[in-house]
Amino acid sequence: VTNKNPGTTDPDFYDYLILGSGAGGCAAAHRLAQTGRRVLLLERGKELPRDGPTTAVDPVLRRRDFHSTEPFHFSATAARNDEFENLGGKTKWYGASLLRFTAEEFLADESHQCPPWPCTAAEFQHSYGEAERLLGVRHFPVERDLRTLLDRLHRTDPAWQEEPQPLGLLPEIGNDDEVRRFDGFTLISDHKADAENRLLAPIRHLPNVTILTETTVKDLLPEAGDSIRLGGVRCADGRIFRASSILLGAGAMHSCRLLARYVQRHELAAALPAPELIGRYFKYHIGSLILAISPRAYSDRLRKTISLLHPEFPHSIVQSSAWIDGELIGARLPAWLPRFAIDALGRHAYAFLLMTEDGSHRDNRVTELPDGGIALAYDHELVRPAIQEHQRLRENFSRTLLRAGYFPLRKRIARYSTSHASGTLVATANPQGSVVDSYGRVLGLKNLRVVDASVFPRIGRGNPALTVFAWALRVAEDLAGETVNSGLVTHLNSA
């Protein structure tokens, strides 16, 4: 690929080319669009329909109409692919829980197998604030049933600490039936802040912004005569797009495979400080769901308002989860079970999500199947501290609920679930042990950056979505400044 001058009128040349429209891709596009330079965002999936199926249990949970069909193997065995392919990425389906990492979660914790970030919490504050502003993050009041449950919980074990759960929801959602189907579903309205409606919608009308869906990128391409500098991308349909800067935002399961292909094809291992780490250090959350069953039916509607912390479990969090009912519970149970019993269970169930930060191990990794699908090699035995803490968390919270008068029903989240995947293009405080630096630059290459959770050396104990938004804004801000400075130098030299 031979790139022309950035001032070219070539319709297939862009200043910034972003791969993926999840939290990172959309945040980067939002910031870079403000430069006035040409931005192209490519998304392999479609724009989701707004006529109802994304809020219905059958198409979403039973038929899995919106999940990726790409082959996926977990520990060498074919497994269900939990990835989504759509404009807005996983943020269209998330529960809008938008927590900041604590200052400690940016630091190393060797006992939990956690390396440090390449930047501090203080360096993230501006980006966190900007992300929260764009997403309209707010707290919601605790409803009556949950207040009763929490009071009983505190009386049983005062060590449980309560914090409001920051949410990207509009207040109107509390007065709408959508409150029952916002977590794990995509809303027809914009009551839930996601990457598309908060970050793409305000810029998609701009003349310098192009968004293409159903466009699968197969290969990164080099600049002619210089494979250290990328020139563009080749898509599955043969189209080629060129750009001055390329940003990977395809997610931790995909961005690493694109980079691995490029480095291998162009024999660039010697140019990168740690090419062997591409795809390694995969991590996610060790998770469980516990239903607190009460003799009395619950009437709370929003429910997802509180986080619980305990000093005995410093890498873990318990969050009150969104509405649950018989239809949701039944989607995961055999069809022969009587519906009236499942509906009764749903009326008496309050859901809690338990998450523990995963540790890092180089042998937990993502590679490519021979047919182009995803291969995830992951062994819980390699991250024993995380597994052990989560087991103790489950036992403690279940026991506390039981003593408080609630019967706990427990379900472990599937090991092959990749909803919070991260770490496969790791950035740490040690450049020689990193693929990416503190501003998303792929070390050893000239114009490739990463704006998704692939870079995370730690995932924290809560949902990492806000940190992905903030990271991408930080990277895009730096890239925009770099572009401005480069343009100024060029102007002065030609004057």
Language model: regions and residue ranges:
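Extreme N-terminal leader/targeting segments of oxidoreductases
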Residues: 1-16, 34-35, 481-495
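Glycine-rich Rossmann-fold phosphate-binding loop(s) that bind the pyrophosphate
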Residues: 20-22, 44, 250, 453
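Glycine-rich loop(s) and the adjacent beta-strand/alpha-helix scaffold that form part
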Residues: 34, 45-50, 54-55, 215, ...
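FAD cofactor-binding and catalytic pocket of flavoenzymes
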Residues: 81, 275-382, 421, 433, ...
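Conserved redox-cofactor binding core of oxidoreductases
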Residues: 110-113, 117-217, 414-417, 421-424
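A glycine-rich dinucleotide-binding beta-alpha-beta segment and adjacent secondary-structure elements
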Residues: 178-183, 188, 213, 218-221, ...
